[in-house]
From Swiss-Prot:
Motif range ('HIGH' region): 126-136
Protein's name according to its UniProt entry: Arginine--tRNA ligase
Example GO molecular function: arginine-tRNA ligase activity
GO BP, sorted A to Z: arginyl-tRNA aminoacylation
Gene source species: Rickettsia bellii (strain OSU 85-389)
Amino acid sequence: MNIFNKLKHDIITASTQLYNNSEIANHASIETPKDSFNGDLSSNIAMIIAAKKNVPPREVALKFKEILNELPYIASIEIAGPGFINFTIKADSWHTAIKDILQNESKFFEIDVDKNKNINIEYVSANPTGPMHIGHARGAVYGDVLANILKKVGYPVTKEYYVNDAGSQINDLVSTVILRYREALGEKITITEGLYPGEYLIPVGQALAKEYGDKLLNMDELERFKIVKNFAIQKMLDLNKEDLKELGVKHDVFFSEQTLHDNGKIEKTVKLLTDMGLIYEGSVPAPKGKVHAEWENRTQELFKSTKYGDDQDRPIRKADGSWTYFASDLAYAKDKIDRGANHLIYVLGADHSGYVKRIEATVKALGKEQVKVDVKICQLVNFVENGVPVKMSKRLGTFASVQDVNHEVGKDIIRFMMLTRENNKTLDFDLIKVKEQSKENPIFYVQYAHVRTLSILSKAMETIPQSYNSFEAGTYDLSLLSSEEEIEIIKLLASWTKTLETAAKYFEPHRVAFYLINLASKFHALWNFGKENNDYRFIIENNVELTTARLALAKAIQKIIASGLEVIGVEPMTRM
């Protein structure tokens, strides 16, 4: 058990002893204070109990201090501010983290999670109308890494892609592909406004011509539409899947929107909501600002989404009687719940930020307040090439595709760099910086740290085999790792599982990248310190025992960096 969980467990035990209640203590946090002056770890347990019991928090804190002071791994306890309990941990307890990382990983990575939670995370879900652009890559990486983190800490997770194959954009795609088909047969064509002018559809038209010849020209229009639609969607979906594969992004399920229509699931969901009294006849207010040409004031079927926190009730049928896109969303959420998911996570692009409340309302209604929902928005990526922004429009035919950028810098750089900013903040992707070999390039800095640790171990095997053999045998005296710099790194290593736990709790995969950058920085600083002072070198040929201990430290750093890169989906480099 890592030090964070150990302290949490002991706080729960103390809470039971003092107040005959362990449940309250489950809500207490164990954090690392921003200022090391406040100790190694801190807890808010006293304030949580004080609020429940209506007693002064410092009085509660003092009671906990009296009990927890007896723990063998606690060096000292101080009460700060309104009632924070700050703990200083004995050095040998930090050293235990190194042993666990090297000899007992399952113990080190032990994290308590809700075993009854079944998570469905939907991400990417790009319309199958063209190659994926670099903006899609941000949501793809965010969702994929978040899913990896959730799995790593122990949750069952389904990674899902929603194929939007039933909307008006598909009609435009079909119209464009038919034109490209005619072009492949020798006709001169004009791509009219509103269609997709990109050259990526030329080979789709050619493939259609190769398979069908000119048979489609004189075919019934409806039959031709169906054939071309299925053909084009499959080609575009294959293209998107290939883009995702090159990015290292994996999904467990590709779910077709069209199946919701074909299988009557929209009708069934609407009937369920009608029986719940959540569907009614009414009208929606005009859009704010300039009235859209397609808006009309009419009576229509609406879902009572305002009952669940939405800004307005949502139409489920269009004027022509067909289902709205939102009606499909309702049925899709119901399908996820029917498949056993009790926590739905949606990862959307910045252009879908207006969908948050309606999605939340949908899940709350269909899950009857028993299914949790979180909607995460990934902001835009400012992609620059030679100082010129690249347009990102499938319709204009000029955009920075995932494939373009992947071929330019590689998937590992893309995946790591997409996590160097929080998902709700705009990200600048600098093609020049990401290829530099300097500490200004975060992925290089982290990979270089990994390579350096391996280099230390390799060099020790050659120059001081006695130390290396002792290290390999697990015979090392970690108490020799006593410098302030070494202890700081060990504390950071010990917090790796806490970082994963926090990243999972708040759906913030960037915490993993930030952690790795911090660890790499501290390791490089320690390594450079050894260049200035021989006593701090990892390998000291006339000090076998200290070298052995530092080899254990180097190996622990290597394993944690490799673990972090694995979570991100980046291959750890072994040489540069």
